[in-house]
């Protein structure tokens, strides 16, 4: 909440109020886990999964990739979306699963542009964004929505579906999860 003291744009009492809504928003995400299980079953043959994002969404991508590797033992990597053109794009082939994280409104269009590049190479796209960003459905093959929140707390919500996806993949491939949920 110290952020509120640093920024004239952010009121600390508003941040406290928003922070108090996070547990309910996490519950709503978990209530939608069957959609992620369905999606995981459709991606049953994925051998490589790439996560892309910009800014803080890149950090979310790193966490999603780590959870995918830790939980399901499926090869995954996270990349800064703007760096795809520097060789990484050559790893994308027909059917490769690419998960684009789009929680930062100012970076949304640029990340969508990178997702379009991946799709042109045959990638199957999953978008992870907030409710209301329905334009992503024009690009992504599957979209997961998280409740709207202050951008300071988007990471707290965005990692939940990625962890659930990793857990669904873990069950699909028959690996035992080493951590308890």
What do these predicted regions represent?
Residues 36-40, 86-89, 114-115:
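Generic recognition of flexible, low-complexity loop/linker segments
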Residues 15, 22, 26-33:
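Long, non-coiled-coil amphipathic alpha-helical linker/lever segments
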Residues 7-21, 54, 101-156, 164, ...:
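Glycine-rich phosphate-binding loops that contact phosphosugars or nucleotide phosphates
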Residues 28, 78, 100, 144-145:
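Structural signal for conserved beta-strand scaffold positions within catalytic alpha/beta enzyme cores
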Residues 23, 27, 62-69, 112, ...:
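Predominant activation on well-ordered alpha-helical scaffold segments within soluble catalytic domains
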Residues 1-10, 170-181:
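Single conserved hydrophobic/aromatic residue that forms the stacking wall/gate
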Residues 42-94, 124-125, 133-135, 164:
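Anionic-ligand anchoring segments at beta-strand to alpha-helix junctions in alpha/beta enzyme folds, i.e.
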Residues 29-45:
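A short, well-structured juxtamembrane/interface segment
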